[in-house]
């Protein structure tokens, strides 16, 4: 019987659902069962055989399966694709992928879960590993997969514990029942065997958090470890570091909960993604699995090979050694006291005491093992619970965040729905207001249409009255035409009669001349003789003739005045009627145009209003439809408590929709009626407009002949246009001359550029001189060095001379050498002085050249700026020339047209003059005088109009001349300011340079001459232009005077 210690016996079965991925092997009796059950998928497959199988299991050799021991995170185990598994012992699913991935290093398993509680659909980071529905795929380490759920695993542990206790009881009873003749096992041997077995079997369940020394021995690269009790990872580095003293362990975590990427303070210890690396002291790192590269079988054989040496470090070895010492002391006492002749009963009691001690030791050992196992289990369960709590807390936090987000989204959607409802209501109110406004506008339009119809009736009455008046005027015109034809016929008859009466007129003229001669003679006689006496026979006849002459002259004057007044009145009446008809025509045209504009405006306004209404209603309908769809989409996903509001909103929206449809129908009907009315009115107005247009066309044909007569007044304008053409041609020639001069100036600028390039060559020569100077300095330095060497030799020779006075011959030789050296030194000094002088001269020349070059560079820069300014001015002038040439071309075309019209008008004038002369010849005296006066009045009006036109053209010409003179003055002023002073400066500055720049001075003088010539040209051009214009004006004045004389 087991002692009531209150402790639960430890479980020896395999735990596949351990959060740390560790597989716990039991005693010898359960190891084979676990190995077999791992293949069959049940941990209790071979533990139900009862206590009878325990001795055989204990006697069987320890051969655990390799797949049951290799349970590291990076080891795939014996899982296959399509196998049924549980993730963390909770989530059932099917394995669909096994291998490496791109999102994290190591081996991973892709599982398709039964429920949508996963994280993906088989794709991570844009890479697809398998296919499954959304939120049913998950990737995990193979160590977190089990073939059974967690509840069954805990049951297997309890069952293994019960079997273990049964085995211990059977062993205990077996050891107590044998007879005295049975073989007694020595204490040391039995304890060692049991300790070896228990140590080997319970080694995987023992905690790996021993001393630092043991951690250093066991931790290897690639081991799965637990850092701080919560973070799992793989060992990537073990050893000393630069950032702190002691032994440190570098771990690559499974999740981004670290602090680095394997590098600290610029030193890299291993490689991993950012936030996946973590360094910790070795005593804080707990190994939770074996390395993926070293199988568990090799580990177990290694432990068995260690033998008894492993027991020295185990906590049970000390108790075993103390028990053995107690047993040895108990067994040794009889031998010391000399009790060798004890009886067999005492011997049997001694044996029973030793067996009791052995059993007590075994029970203590078992209790110790159970406590250790329970401690390991508790630690594993605590670690599992902490990890599970962390995961649950994370899930709870995620669920809380999702719930809060969902609540916030639902509130936002509800708020949006409310806002949409409010906006729809506001839009409904706005639409009702707009409909009211549109109705008012339609009523206003109807009122306007009625007003237009009233005004249209008034206009029709006015047009009828005007038609009647026009008919009366046409009748009066016909009467006047008939009268004019009658007068023409009378004139023709008079012309025929005058031909017959010419001879009589000649005779009468001859008689008149004779009579005049006689009258003169008589007058002379009367003057000489005085008044005739009353009794003279010719006195009565003379008086009678005088009276007749006076009466004839008075009658002739009276008749001419009457005819003149009559013709003037008729002309004034005709002119007034013509003016009235013109005003009426213009008035009718304006009224017709206004009516057309009003009709078009009304139709366009109606169409615009209808288009606006249609677009507004369409947009409102589409907006309402969209808002309804959005509300349906948002409210369908919300909770069930919002269904009532959704129903209300749907009802409200349907009501609004029906109201809008009704309003649309009403508006469409009104629009159709209004459009039909407008179309009818438009057709009626078109008919009236066509009638008015026909009437206007008749009036226009009637007055077109009279307007063509007025066009003959513009014939004299052609002469002035021809004069303008001549002036323009002269100006074009002047501009061409200026263009030639500008081209010469451009050539001068190019020459200056060439001179600048020569100056640049000079600069290159100056650089060469600088190089030669540097070489001369180097030679001077070398000569100085030689001089120093010679002086040293001279000093050495002098020292030799002072020390050796005895050797005179040698001293003479040395003196000769010193003389020679002195001469060479003097020659070198002379050369050095010469070179110094040359160097100073060269330096002065170089400085002068530098100053000249800098001056030339500044001059070149200024010259380039001026050249650019001149080029810009040239381009501007060319553009002005082009515009002027275009204007002159257009003016020449206009002049040609005007000249043709002048020729036509001159021909018509000549024909009219011929007709007038013939009419004057054939007409009698009073009619001739009247026609002359009429024609003079007409010609005076025409001359006045022509004079006005001539004045306008002269003013235009003067304006053009002023613009041209201003542009010429501006151009010449720019030329004078920019080119001439700069050329002078360049001349004065280039004269101070070397002989290579003299050609530039000559060219500059040529350019200056060109500029002076250009200065003198504008005055000549202006004088020529002014003289030409003055001659033209003088000729025009002469022509006008001649015309006035005629």
Curated annotation (Swiss-Prot):
Q: Where in the cell is it found?
A: Cytoplasm; Cytoplasm, Cytoskeleton
**GO MF annotation terms:** microtubule binding; microtubule plus-end binding
Cited Pfam families: CAP_GLY (PF01302)
Residue ranges, compositional bias (Low complexity): 27-38, 48-69, 314-338
Which SMART domains does the record cross-reference, listed alphabetically?
Answer: CAP_GLY (SM01052)
Q: Where does the record place the modification Phosphoserine?
A: 49, 202, 207, 211, 314, 923, 973, 979
Q: Where is this region: Disordered?
A: 1-71, 143-162, 195-215, 313-339, 1018-1046
Coiled-coil region list: 354-524, 561-636, 673-1016
- Keyword Phosphoprotein listed: yes
Top-level taxon of origin: Eukaryota
User: Biological process GO terms, please?
Assistant: cytoplasmic microtubule organization
Q: Which residues form the CAP-Gly domain?
A: 99-141, 239-281
Keyword entries, A-Z: Coiled coil, Cytoplasm, Cytoskeleton, Microtubule, Phosphoprotein, Repeat, Williams-Beuren syndrome
Q: Where is the composition biased (Polar residues)?
A: 143-153, 195-210, 1023-1034
Provide GO CC annotations from the record: cell cortex; microtubule associated complex; microtubule plus-end; nucleus
InterPro entries cross-referenced by the UniProt entry: CAP-Gly_dom_sf, CAP-Gly_domain
- Give the compositionally biased regions (Basic and acidic residues): 1035-1046
What is the annotated role of this protein in its UniProt record? Seems to link microtubules to dendritic lamellar body (DLB), a membranous organelle predominantly present in bulbous dendritic appendages of neurons linked by dendrodendritic gap junctions. May operate in the control of brain-specific organelle translocations.
Q: How does it assemble?
A: Interacts with CLASP1 and CLASP2. Binds preferentially to tyrosinated microtubules, and only marginally to detyrosinated microtubules.
Q: Which disease is it linked to?
A: CLIP2 is located in the Williams-Beuren syndrome (WBS) critical region. WBS results from a hemizygous deletion of several genes on chromosome 7q11.23, thought to arise as a consequence of unequal crossing over between highly homologous low-copy repeat sequences flanking the deleted region. Haploinsufficiency of CLIP2 may be the cause of certain cardiovascular and musculo-skeletal abnormalities observed in the disease. However, it has been demonstrated that haploinsufficiency of this gene alone is not sufficient to cause any of the cognitive or facial features of WBS.
Protein name according to UniProt: CAP-Gly domain-containing linker protein 2
What organism does this protein naturally occur in?
Homo sapiens (Human)
